[in-house]
């Protein structure tokens, strides 16, 4: 099942697989000399700009981060939100020792900026907006364990959720929910629109 792109002049017309987007990302770094941490900074800033535009009255933000680059984007959002005067808590999914590269760098920047970083144990009751930075476009198997619990908690919270790149639990190529998936109020997709956002379950996430 494929659903047409929304009729919006702001959306690009092409759709891409996760592998194609990863290749575009690699070429951007290698051919244009843009460092990976700079790309992550730009992605996080784009997501934070969207958060401010959609929820200008939001004051308390919960950022759920995973251990990959999606989580790294989340740390950028958290740092920018804190710098803007918002109350931010970062809730970690997965073992933080698995953080590498640019994601680890931005986790360290978050801590250096005075940010608090703790394991996920539920959505704080006073949260205004949730940022989903748990699972990215590389997901290929069903979500289980604490990840599934966190996704279910997001969906049950009644709070709007901004997904980074793709809602956690959604297959970026097929649009199939991998057991559990975040139902986001909005998704900020980087580099190119992922095919899975417009196929199968994608439009409902």
Summary of predicted features, one role per range:
Residues 2-130, 135, 139-145:
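A cross-family phosphate/adenosyl-ligand binding-site feature
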Residues 2-23, 127-205:
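YjeF_N-associated NAD(P)HX repair module
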């Amino acid at each position: 099942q494929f659903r047409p792109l929304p009729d919006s002049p702001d959306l690009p017309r092409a759709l891409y697989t996760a592998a194609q987007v990863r290749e575009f990302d690699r070429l951007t770094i290698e051919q244009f000399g843009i460092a990976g941490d700079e790309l992550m900074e730009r992605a996080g800033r784009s997501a934070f700009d969207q958060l401010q535009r959609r929820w200008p009255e939001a004051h308390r933000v919960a950022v759920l981060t995973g251990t990959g680059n999606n989580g790294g984007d989340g740390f950028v959002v958290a740092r920018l939100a804190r710098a803007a005067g918002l109350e931010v808590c970062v809730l970690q999914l997965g073992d933080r020792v698995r953080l590498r590269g640019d994601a680890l760098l931005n986790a360290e920047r978050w801590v250096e900026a005075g940010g608090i970083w703790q394991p996920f144990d539920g959505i704080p009751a006073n949260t205004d907006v949730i940022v989903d930075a748990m699972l990215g476009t590389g997901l290929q198997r069903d979500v289980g364990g604490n990840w599934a619990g966190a996704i279910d908690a997001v969906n049950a919270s009644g709070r709007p959720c901004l997904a980074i790149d793709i809602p956690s639990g959604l297959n970026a190529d097929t649009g199939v929910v991998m057991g559990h998936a975040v139902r986001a109020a909005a998704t900020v997709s980087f580099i190119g629109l992922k095919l899975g956002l417009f196929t199968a379950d994608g439009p409902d996430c």
